[in-house]
Design a protein with these regions (language model features):
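Negatively charged, low-complexity tracts enriched in Asp/Glu with abundant Ser/Thr
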Residues: 1-33, 57-61
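Intrinsically disordered, low-complexity coil/linker segments enriched for acidic/polar
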Residues: 2, 43, 48, 71-72
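Short, low-complexity interaction segments enriched in Ser/Thr/Pro/Gly
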Residues: 5-6, 41, 81
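Compositionally biased, intrinsically disordered/low-complexity regions enriched for serine, proline
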Residues: 16, 39, 44, 66-67, ...
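Long, continuous compositionally biased terminal/linker segments
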Residues: 31-63
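Mixed-charge, Lys/Arg-enriched low-complexity segments
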Residues: 53-92
């Protein structure tokens, strides 16, 4: 399985995984609208650790780091809830 496959399955209310956007770091992107997105980048040399970058407009608004094991549905669900909570200030 692709190391980012489980991250692509994150269910974050109001945000949608965008399969058309990627970068050289292997990041995946979730969009809310044209100017707001969440980039999830795997941390090199640290398996299952990801950098979540919230971008508003053209500026990085917040950077979060979390461990998300690929075979742990509870960890995936908890991560989605945590990220959703962190995204709330940027949704107005």
């Amino acid at each position: 399985m692709d190391s980012m496959e489980h991250i692509k399955k994150l269910k974050i209310e109001g945000w949608v995984y965008n399969p058309d956007v990627e970068d050289k770091l292997g990041s995946v992107y979730f969009d809310r609208d044209e100017d707001n997105y969440l980039r999830v980048t795997p941390l090199k040399n640290n398996p299952n650790t990801y950098i979540f970058t919230i971008t508003q407009g053209c500026e990085d608004a917040e950077i979060l780091i979390s461990v998300v094991p690929p075979d742990d549905e509870l960890a995936l669900s908890n991560t989605a809830l945590w990220i959703k909570k962190e995204l709330q200030p940027y949704e107005s």
